[in-house]
A protein has these predicted regions:
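C-terminal engagement/docking regions of AAA+ P-loop ATPases
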Residues: 89-175
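An amphipathic alpha-helix signature
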Residues: 31, 35-39, 77, 81, ...
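Canonical AAA+ ATPase core
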Residues: 1-54, 61-68, 110-113
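Alpha-helix N-capping/helix-start residues
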Residues: 14, 31-32, 56, 74, ...
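Residues at alpha-helix boundaries and short interhelical turns
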Residues: 28, 70, 74, 117-120
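Conserved AAA+ ATPase small/helical "lid" subdomain
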Residues: 49-105
Length: 175
């Protein structure tokens, strides 16, 4: 999709948008970074042949390793479902996210935890990814424009419950 220039392209229907994992809005880089891109483009082009090639089997092996070694607590899954249900029931939401989006976010959460050097998914991981996974899956009611506010409102109570259950578990472990 190219919302700036729709010539020859058409917006996808909502069910087809559900097939994309993330919606990421990118801003232009700052002036200094843009100058650096211009100054180093030949270097990057010349070294592109030296890039390490990753095979399909490498990717599948990494996926298996992450799946086996990065734990997703039941409390994280519960918070995810509760947030989704709140979104679906919110009067500001015309169409909520699908269960498919919940299934798809789980491995993404595991990868983010791995990148952050952990063997478990945290509430912070959920807060980081959820807006990007749900932004294009939730259709707001007419007149409602701020998806992030709606999401924050729907996340508040489940995330507070998650924090309490995590704290309770940590206290029980140290006692």
């Amino acid at each position: 999709q190219n919302p700036l220039d729709l010539v020859g392209t058409y917006p996808l229907p909502t069910p087809q948008l559900d097939r994309f994992l993330f919606k990421i809005t990118m801003a232009h880089i700052d002036r200094d970074a843009e100058l650096q891109v211009l100054d180093t483009w030949q270097q990057r082009r010349d070294h592109s042949q030296e890039a390490v090639k990753v095979s399909r089997s490498d990717i599948l092996a990494a996926r298996r390793t992450i799946d086996e070694q990065v734990h997703i607590a039941q409390a994280i899954k519960t918070a995810l479902v509760d947030i989704s249900r709140r979104l679906r029931d919110d009067e500001r939401v015309l169409q909520g996210n699908s269960t498919r989006s919940l299934v798809l976010i789980l491995p993404a959460l595991q990868v983010l935890a791995t990148l952050r050097g952990r063997a478990y998914v945290s509430a912070e991981d959920l807060e980081t990814l959820l807006p990007h996974v749900l932004a294009h899956r939730v259709e707001l009611a007419p007149g409602i424009a701020d998806f992030n506010k709606v999401l924050r409102d729907c996340m508040r109570e489940p995330m507070e419950h998650l924090a309490r259950s995590t704290l309770k578990k940590a206290t029980a472990t140290t006692a």
